[in-house]
């Protein structure tokens, strides 16, 4: 019996395997992949899981070099299978802990897409499922390392998009304020008039720190 299900992305254009019992992709990869509206030479999917963001971006941007970093080895193996099934020559996945800086990629990426774990380990009860545990829970120290590495991996004129919990926004902004960045926050609402659960951050390098707010993304009209 297979441990993963065979699903599809982009109305069947992309074959997508993911764990049956473990972390399964939600709306976040679709929102992040939709932010890629220009041509970028080098794109990093930081925390790539089974690869939904990378697969969509590689399909839509065949001339871009797309790399996925993922710590969980089971997720990584499935992402490699997904790449093989879809035959994307511009995509590769690496087993890598996003909280550990890889100097080989310093100032390397034009674009970074990332959906770090949402929940702080000391504030919630953690799942015993390793796949879910790796995908949903993180310490405050490790989230700070993750964000720091995003900035270090970006080129001077690079851009990053990050989705996380709306309630974590103040914590993340305090970290980002240490850098010269322009940060635009966009609340993500399930319905018009509802309270935001998640937030999209757009980050670009700047001469000094600037914070902006954009109109909310509403998932269900």
Question: How should these model regions be labeled?
Answer:
Residues 32, 115, 146, 203:
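Residue-level signal for inorganic ion chemistry
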Residues 33, 128-131, 178-179:
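Glycine-rich, phosphate-binding/catalytic loops in enzymes
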Residues 2-42, 48-59, 202, 211-213, ...:
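SAM-dependent Rossmann-like transferase core, predominantly class I methyltransferases
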Residues 34-105, 111-125:
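Conserved SAM/SAH cofactor-binding pocket of Class I
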Residues 190-221:
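SAM/dcSAM-binding transferase cores
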Residues 116-145:
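Mobile active-site "lid"/loop adjacent to the S-adenosyl-L-methionine
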Residues 15-17, 21, 141-196:
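Conserved Class I SAM-dependent methyltransferase catalytic core
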Residues 11, 61-63, 88, 106, ...:
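Short, well-ordered coil/turn elements that cap or connect secondary structure elements
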